[in-house]
């Protein structure tokens, strides 16, 4: 039996709950598999976890093509893929992303934050954060610099969504990003990964993913 098919689900669908909201999606979207509350994936008792529409999701991972949001596990230069991870939202949704921004940008003494800019084209705030890491190679110490770029949107001093992009030193450009956003009405936080070249489309991606999940709420 497939890990994505359970006795209390419709055949070919994956079902579970986020904060008492039942979500059911076609199994072709789910990659590699949904995790439910209970034992960790690394625990042999993982297979004993309650599954299906009455169980709580720990994470619902999905892969889909852009821009039609069709299920896709294909690895090809001709197919643009976005990876989506939906998890239960815990705590106050009004402060969640503001705190997440603080953690990414300010927490930790090894971080060096760049100047704050406002990107007029994207209509987003932007700054860079560099973490200096000392590495021992043989008998020598080497300094490694890990740089990431952050974009975010604020309304009434609250962060609405947050984007992190990884810097690729060898190419001297950002190459992969993820965006965090919330869907409070179904008690869900969402992270999705996309190519940095699609940054200008990330607002459309977020809205399409939000609608996709809301459309798959099971009444």
Enumerate the language-model features and the residues they cover.
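Long, compositionally biased interface segments
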Residues: 166-219
């Amino acid at each position: 039996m497939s890990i994505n098919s359970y006795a209390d689900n419709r055949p070919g669908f994956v079902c579970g709950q986020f904060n008492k909201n039942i979500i059911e999606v076609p199994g072709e979207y789910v990659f590699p598999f949904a995790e439910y509350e209970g034992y960790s994936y690394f625990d042999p008792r993982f297979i004993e976890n309650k599954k299906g529409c009455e169980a709580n999701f720990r994470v619902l991972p999905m892969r889909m093509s852009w821009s039609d949001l069709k299920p896709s596990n294909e690895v090809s230069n001709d197919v643009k893929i976005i990876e989506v991870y939906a998890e239960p939202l815990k705590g106050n949704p009004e402060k969640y992303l503001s705190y997440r921004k603080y953690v990414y940008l300010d927490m930790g003494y090894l971080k060096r934050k760049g100047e704050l800019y406002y990107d007029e084209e994207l209509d987003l705030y932007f700054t860079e954060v560099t973490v200096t890491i000392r590495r021992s190679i043989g008998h020598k110490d080497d300094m490694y610099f890990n740089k990431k770029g952050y974009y975010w949107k604020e309304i009434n001093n609250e962060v609405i969504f947050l984007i992190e992009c990884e810097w690729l030193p060898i190419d001297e450009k950002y190459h992969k990003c993820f965006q965090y956003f919330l869907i409070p009405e179904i008690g869900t936080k969402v992270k999705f990964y996309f190519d940095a070249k699609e940054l200008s489309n990330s607002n459309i991606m977020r809205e399409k993913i939000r609608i996709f999940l809301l459309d798959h709420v099971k009444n």
